[in-house]
Amino acid sequence: MNAPGNIASGGTKRFQAKRDAILAAAADAINEQSAKGMTFADVARRVGLNTTSVTYYFKRKEDLAAAAFEQTLGQLDAMLDTALEEATPEARVARYLNINMERLARIRRGDERDFAILSDLRAMEDPVKGRLLTGWRNIFRKTRSLWGAGASRAETDLFGARAHVLLENTFWLTAWLPRYEVDEYPRVEARLMEVFRSGIAAPGQDWRPELLDLVHEEPEPGREAFLLAATRLINELGYRGASVQRIASELNVTKGSFYHHLDAKDELVIACYKRSFDIIADAQRLAESHEGSHWQRLDSTIATLLDYQFSERGPLLRTTALSGLPPQVRSTMIDRSNRIARRFAGMLSDGIAEGSIRAIDPLVASQALMALQNAAFDMRKWASTMPREKAVAFYASTLAYGLFDDRALKG
């Protein structure tokens, strides 16, 4: 006969294995549909259970989403602990990137499941939301510590910008890495690390951007203010978290007025994306018509978009809203994003030929630039603690000159 302890141990292992399977299925559902869009029925179907069986492990859908997010935070924490074992900031960043790339290779080969993306954290309800955001802030601080303790407030601010750009670039990998064969991942990793190590500007190229005269108006009166308010809410609460009622109340209009502008909520997020992509493309076009080197055109584009993100005119819509969209619409939005990235790649290629930009992989570097300008919205509070020009220079320096270059501190 089995000893009682062995039976209990076996039961605990079975319980844990089933719980882990439910969490993995929940992560897939969150990544496809967002936390708000995830249902018990869908998660149950993915693991071959009925809905009642799932509630044995997690009483409420919110509990399941929170557990999936906590698992992600735990994995990020462990990855950072491993990276922190290295002796220098550069070695730590290289190790952290390598851990991420190897994890994504295992996922691509089917050897591992992905964890839940964290874009819906702010759409959760308190007290769970407070606990999760505290966990996220701890991850941010630990990432910042890859560069050690800042000797001054300015150094801490710069390390914070570097941490954010590193995290966002590793999160953004899932959007563009599938365009490569899995056996190319080591080469892509090396090329991205080159950008992190030395930046995109060639030696001797200074940071002297000219802010471009970026003016964007929607053809219909009132639509620009409407889309701007919707973009802010969707960035803060996620696509599913920003209800039509909430957007309407933010603008102090009725739900009927909302439907005067757009027929459905999917149309709203598509319109917000179109507005954001149009603004980025406008900046690229304006820069290309300017005098100066290709680096000067690129640094003006980056500075203009970051200034826009940090100002009251912004933000641009975060790509995190993609997880709430129907697959076909999401694919269309990613295609537009990739066209914009290819335009950045063209600017980089011209600069490489000219000698004003380092000999880097322009396709890889262009996606790093997409992550940089896309994620800047989250750093608005950080940027508000210093002059705008300084915030833009600090944040842009992370890719202009790399994650280990301190010249922005002397500016």
Region spans (language model):
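An extended, acidic
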Residues: 302-303, 313-335, 339, 346, ...
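Amphipathic alpha-helical segments used for helix-helix packing
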Residues: 92, 101-130, 144, 309-328, ...
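Helix-turn-helix
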Residues: 21, 29-63, 67, 229, ...
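Generic hydrophobic, amphipathic alpha-helix propensity
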Residues: 18-27, 43, 68-72, 76, ...
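Hydrophobic alpha-helical connector segments
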Residues: 67, 81-110, 159, 271, ...
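Short, well-structured alpha-helical segments
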Residues: 94, 156-167, 299, 303, ...
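Amphipathic alpha-helical packing segments from all-alpha helical-bundle domains
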Residues: 77, 124-151, 160-164, 171, ...
